[in-house]
Amino acid sequence: MVDARGSTPCLIGDSIRNVNDGNSLDFQYTNQFNEESEASRLLTPQTSSNHALSKMQKDDDIRDRSYTSVAELNREGALLTDEVDLENVDASKVRSNRDDLEAEEKRKKLLLLKKKQRNKSINSESFSSPSLRASKSNSLITSTDPVEDHISKYSSSGTPENITGEADDEDEDIIRNSYGQMIKNNSNRPHLAKGESYQSAEQEIDHTAPEKSEKRQERSGRSFDRQKSSAEFLRSLSRSISRGPTKNKTVSPSKGEDSRMYSTSNYSISLVDLENGPKIIPETLEEEQEDAEKEGVLMEDEGNEEYTKDLEEAANKAQPQ
């Protein structure tokens, strides 16, 4: 920092903050530059605004045309400001909650109307001729599960009978399977809560059914197969229990030690025979070997086997002389 006289202040024993540099050349040049820039800005305000606008336009040209900036909307008057009369805003296109409620009510009415039409079509199909229903049931493609399991009776003319009266018990037992065939409903048998069992239900089915082969062909919830498999399982279980070893076997005191038995799941032997087993087996093998030697079955390895005279004579004749 140099003052007007060209000398530098001495900082020995003093601080730089206490130095008066108002007369320095650097301070005078800085103040003069700031005053000139402020005067030029005050004299030409229109020029600065035009420069800013041109710069914005250049930026807009460079930017993507599909994007609209907030500044553009504000210049065009698209944004609501304090200068706009908010009371005169056109709100005719704004949807209210009342319109939503009316639309919801209309939608519910349409759904109810469609449901009624569907019920009418189902009722009309149920009153159709039995021949048409039979032709539909024969096809696996067109057959569907019925809405109601109750099947009404038809007269020879094709009109339904006993529609208003009470349904018979036979009709309640008849249902339609997934193939469209009419079968008896035996899915609720046996009724275990009433004390029935699978054996009683199987006997009842065999007694009431005219032919057993036809009963097996019906698909009544596979109740017949379940009853049969359960009966077979019970029989096999009783057989396996009867084959098992007798746990409560009494031993008579007169037999003594010979009555002690070694039992397994399949057989039982005496403990005496079990202890004497290693001695009995070699004796049995020796006896069998002696019997075989007596019968002439075994041959010695030394080559001094004894043959009968007939065999020796036949062998001598066969040898070439």
UniProtKB/Swiss-Prot annotation:
Residues 284-305 have a biased composition (Acidic residues). GO terms for cellular component: cytoplasm. It is found in: Cytoplasm. Its main location: cytoplasm. Residues 43-52, 120-145, 153-162, 178-189, 237-253 have a biased composition (Polar residues). Residues 204-229, 306-315 have a biased composition (Basic and acidic residues). Keywords: Acetylation, Cytoplasm, Phosphoprotein. Residues 37-63, 115-270, 283-321 are annotated as: Disordered. The modification Phosphothreonine is found at T44, T159. The modification N-acetylvaline is found at V2. The modification Phosphoserine is found at S49, S69, S121, S126, S129, S137, S139, S238, S240, S242, S270. Present with 18600 molecules/cell in log phase SD medium. This is Uncharacterized protein YLR257W. It comes from Saccharomyces cerevisiae (strain ATCC 204508 / S288c).
